[in-house]
């Protein structure tokens, strides 16, 4: 039951991510210069938030630690966003970001993406997708919202005016029931985070 709910949210979030990815790719094809400017501003914002250039890191161990910490923080943020059932919106931004990174690579790094690049991007995106979908599935059961656009839209229309919507009456039972699934999910996410940091540092 928990797996089914998580997969349903993962599929919904994936559609938002893929849609934004494809639309952004089309816009890059139409307006490459404007989209490159947008990517440059996004990169500046990420650096202001704490991301560092490779040149700023003294050793590969420093690079591994930095990538792991930044990605772990991002994954936690996406999990928290999923708890308030805003993951489809967030995954749209993920699709936009990775489309900019992928399709503007010839301008940004001087070459098109190779197999390793696509594997890295796919692994990073899947980690965020899984984190947001797992928490959304838990929150969906907690607040009585299924992974359908009609129910999500109905929830969004009524939730903006409330800091935290009221959960269903048996929320304690739901929380206990989700504890094993959330624990397993945390282990899987930790493994993915370590793999991504290792691959980006040592795998190229």
Model-found features: residue ranges?
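Juxtamembrane inter-helical linkers in multi-pass membrane proteins
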Residues: 42-53, 145-171
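Cytosolic juxtamembrane amphipathic/interface segments immediately preceding
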Residues: 1-10, 161-175
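N-terminal signal-anchor transmembrane alpha helix
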Residues: 3-39
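Membrane-interface interhelical connector segments
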Residues: 34-58, 104-117
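Interfacial helix-start motif at the membrane-water boundary
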Residues: 51-79
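Alpha-helical transmembrane segments of helical membrane proteins, especially in multi-pass transport
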Residues: 120-148
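Juxtamembrane boundary at the C-terminal end of a transmembrane helix
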Residues: 191-204
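Conserved mixed alpha/beta catalytic, RNA-binding, or beta-rich assembly cores of soluble enzyme
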Residues: 86-116
């Amino acid at each position: 039951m928990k797996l089914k709910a998580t997969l349903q949210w993962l599929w919904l979030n994936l559609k938002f991510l893929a849609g934004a990815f494809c639309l952004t790719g089309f816009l890059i094809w139409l307006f490459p210069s404007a989209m490159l400017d947008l990517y440059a501003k996004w990169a500046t914002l990420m650096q202001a938030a704490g991301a560092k250039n490779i040149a700023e890191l003294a050793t590969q161990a420093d690079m591994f630690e930095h990538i792991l910490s930044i990605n772990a923080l991002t994954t936690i943020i996406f999990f928290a966003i999923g708890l308030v059932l805003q993951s489809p919106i967030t995954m749209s931004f993920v699709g936009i970001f990775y489309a900019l990174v992928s399709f503007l690579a010839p301008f940004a790094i001087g070459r098109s993406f190779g197999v390793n690049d696509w594997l890295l991007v796919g692994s990073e995106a899947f980690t965020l997708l899984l984190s947001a979908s797992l928490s959304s599935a838990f929150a969906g059961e907690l607040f009585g919202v299924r992974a359908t656009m009609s129910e999500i839209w109905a929830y969004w229309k009524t939730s903006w005016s409330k800091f935290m919507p009221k959960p269903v009456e048996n929320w304690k039972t739901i929380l206990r029931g989700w504890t094993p699934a959330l624990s397993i999910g945390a282990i899987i996410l930790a493994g993915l985070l370590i793999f991504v940091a290792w691959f980006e540092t040592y795998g190229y």
